[in-house]
Amino acid sequence: MTALSTNSSSGGIFKIAIVGAGGINFGTPEGPWNNAQRVEKVLGKSLRVTALINPLINESERVLKSKCASDVAFAYENTKTYVSVTEYLEYLDSHPEDVPSAYLIGIPPDFHGCTTPGMDMELEILRKYPNAALFIEKPITSAPVQGAFNLVHELEKYHAIISIGYMFRYLKIVQAAKKYVADNNLNIACTIARYNSAYEHNNKLFWWYMSKSGGPVVEQATHFCDLSIYFGGDVDTSTVKVNRVNWYDPCGKLAKVPVDEESIPKEERIPRFTAASWKYKSGAVGILAHSIILQGTNYDTCLELQADGHYVRMVDFYGQPRLYIRSPEADSERIINFPEDDPYYNEFDAFLGVVQGRYPPSRILSKFDDGAKTYELTKIITNN
């Protein structure tokens, strides 16, 4: 992996093409995600969004109208809109001066993440620009798992800079926990991940369809499957076991579903609670508990690590993240926190810093093969 050289921004200008005009790239009411906002903070006055690619032009126009009325208008005032990456790449054929320094891909997973035509957006770009820099949101694909691993092998042919949007790896409490584990040479015996989401403002209809979103584990709990692997290592996928509360169970009836769930076929309705367990190849055990039961807006999240004499607990990943550590020296926990830490900012600072040559490639903490392993675990849990 090398720093981007293809049309690297001259004169201090950094050109970005954004794929997707939806919530992950431009924000939603029920969460802190807003990729464009973080890119704006990292790049400041040097940012120029030269392309916004989205199949619905009216969505692109709505976003651009809002941006051009804001204090970052300078970055969007000359943005061109396209309905597909194919159309955009055809434009670049005759306008090489507009080749971007990076692509920000934040769209549903149906269009990328494998080698199948129509779902191979990464390859579509890299065949023309093999040194391109791609930031790809999770989940990496909706294709069969083997398709994602096929793409892992194809990507080895290119010199692309690729970062997957597992932002929690970049939290300072997570990195502090990684350092604590390494410094104390801990042999992790168990990881316990808990993710309780607030559902009443999640009014994206596709999210409530199993076949469209992939289900809540693939779409949402994926973050904590990823963190579990980050600390626990590779999973023995033959050991995965799952229990769940479904929509038709008495305790699965939700009072404030923000969409007309009756319009969704019964076989497509998503589970309310999922409990999964597995063994890592190291012999350790992993546990995941995910729910869509909370109301309001705040999520409740926690990841625990257990090792001989040590208990490491990370909480409130979407709010004010805190790290609790109990060691053999004392029964009481010590608390470590980093006020106002923003993992979204941290991941884009790392990605863009590598593209600019400010950081070594190792600053990117989630590569495509990491994303493929996480996707594999979430699909096995979902299909179990």
From Swiss-Prot:
Residues making up the signal peptide according to the UniProt record: none
- Top-level lineage group: Eukaryota
Q: Which GO MF term does the entry hold, naming one?
A: nucleotide binding
Q: Which residues form a coiled coil?
A: none
An example of a Gene Ontology cellular component annotation for this protein is:
cytosol
Xref: InterPro entries: Gfo/Idh/MocA-like_OxRdtase_N, Gfo/Idh/MocA_Oxidoreductase, OxRdtase_put_C
Q: Which family does it belong to?
A: To S.pombe SpAC2E11.17.
Its name, as the record gives it, is Uncharacterized protein C12C2.04
- Supply the source organism for this entry: Schizosaccharomyces pombe (strain 972 / ATCC 24843) (Fission yeast)
